[in-house]
Design a protein with these regions (language model features):
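Glycine-rich, often acidic, oxyanion-interacting loops/wings at catalytic, nucleic-acid
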Residues: 136-205
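Conserved DEDDh/DEDDy metal-dependent 3′-5′ exonuclease domain
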Residues: 49-90
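Extended, highly charged alpha-helical segments
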Residues: 105-149
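Gly/Thr-rich phosphate-binding beta-strand-loop-beta motif of the actin/hexokinase/Hsp70
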Residues: 7-28, 106
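Nucleic-acid-processing active sites and adjacent nucleic-acid-binding tracks
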Residues: 31-56
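Short alpha-helix plus adjacent loop in nuclease-associated cores
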Residues: 80-119, 171-176
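Intrinsically disordered, low-complexity and often Lys/Arg-enriched segments
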Residues: 1-11, 43, 53, 78
Length: 205
């Protein structure tokens, strides 16, 4: 079997299928060909890995994988993260979720000669990326809120031109015009939407 340079001359490889509360591990001895499936609870996961001694770990790239990769690399392990779409190609049964098969697919994908791994970010790099993601989410939420306000006010004949600039320029006037709405509950709801809009603007800064 042809394997990539990362997996060559490595005696032990651990493929880990992560979940919220438990971890499925496939421990493979490359010299003997022996494979062992182990499932451990989250609280015992780190200790179980450390007991194996420094080796090669394959993990599917997910929300927590960057953290695990940095942690185990700090203990002398080599960690390689694999994009989920690449692993999926090696699943024997894609319709039925099975942790052991998932771990097997991670291992099989990890040793392929053409597998491209996901770069492990430093904590600082990950923080910057997350802040960027949060800012994008705030922009999306702000646009959604402004469209909602526009839609509600249009029901009462209050119209503003499209675009953030136009909305921001007219926002005070729009708010004052919304005061013309007689229903107190609806008026309060619109007021809260304006407040939410301003909060989203602050989050974008």
């Amino acid at each position: 079997m042809i394997i990539n340079k990362v997996a060559q001359n490595v005696e032990t490889i651990i493929a880990v299928d992560t979940a919220k509360n438990s971890f499925q591990m496939l421990v493979v001895n490359q010299k003997t060909g022996k494979k062992k499936n182990v499932k451990v609870q989250r609280s015992k996961f780190v200790d179980h890995i450390l007991k194996q001694g420094p080796c090669l770990i394959f993990m599917e790239s997910c929300s927590a994988s960057q953290y695990w990769a940095r942690l185990f690399e700090s203990h002398g392990f080599t960690v390689k993260l694999i994009a989920a779409q690449h692993v999926k190609a090696f699943l024997r049964n894609k319709r039925v979720k099975n942790d052991e098969r998932d771990a097997e697919a991670i291992y099989t994908c990890g040793i392929q000669p053409d597998t491209k791994f996901v770069r492990i970010k430093t904590e600082e790099e990950q923080t910057v990326a997350l802040l960027h993601t949060l800012r994008k989410a705030a922009v999306s939420e702000r646009v959604e809120i402004s469209n909602r306000i526009r839609g509600i006010l249009a029901e009462f004949g209050i119209i503003t031109a499209k675009g953030k600039g136009n909305f921001n320029n007219d926002i005070q006037e729009l708010f004052e015009q919304s005061e013309q709405i007689h229903n107190v509950n609806l008026k309060n709801s619109i007021t809260r939407l304006f407040e939410d809009y301003h909060r989203m603007e602050e989050r974008e800064k």
